[in-house]
């Protein structure tokens, strides 16, 4: 499956990220880039993007990067550092890059920046390769 097809599959079939408003905008082997137009529903009571939303962006970007190798993978572990609050931001950009790609276990580093390029989050995720070729599992 081509990367453009994988991007389209993620943007249409991933109901959680679709509900969030997260869009996959770039993907290649071991890499993914996602964007989120920040809306009121993403905010917490102090006017910052909710930490759970930021975690979901980071995990989703890493998950897309993990699937770039052609099979589905699932999160095993995630560690996140919130470096700066996401106050008064309009857009969030998450980029995930492979640190190590193994036969079953792979590690990805994700960074989230605002529209001005300020680093807000750095995270690391470990994924387990399910060895299920993309297209072989349905969402039914």
Identify the role of each PLM range.
Residues 1-140:
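Terminal targeting signals and extreme-terminal segments of soluble enzymes
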């Amino acid at each position: 499956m081509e990367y453009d097809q994988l991007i389209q599959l993620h943007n249409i079939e991933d109901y959680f990220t679709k509900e969030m408003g997260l869009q996959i905008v770039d993907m290649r082997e071991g890499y993914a880039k996602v964007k989120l137009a920040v809306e009121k529903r993403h905010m917490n009571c102090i006017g910052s993007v909710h930490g759970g939303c930021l975690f979901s962006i980071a995990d989703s970007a890493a998950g897309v990067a993990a699937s770039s190798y052609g099979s589905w993978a699932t999160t095993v572990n995630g560690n996140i550092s919130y470096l700066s609050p996401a106050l008064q931001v309009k857009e969030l950009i998450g980029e995930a890059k492979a640190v190590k790609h193994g036969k079953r276990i792979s590690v990805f580093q994700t960074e989230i920046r605002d529209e001005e390029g300020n680093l807000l989050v750095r995270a690391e995720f470990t994924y387990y390769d399910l060895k299920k070729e993309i297209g072989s599992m349905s969402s039914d």
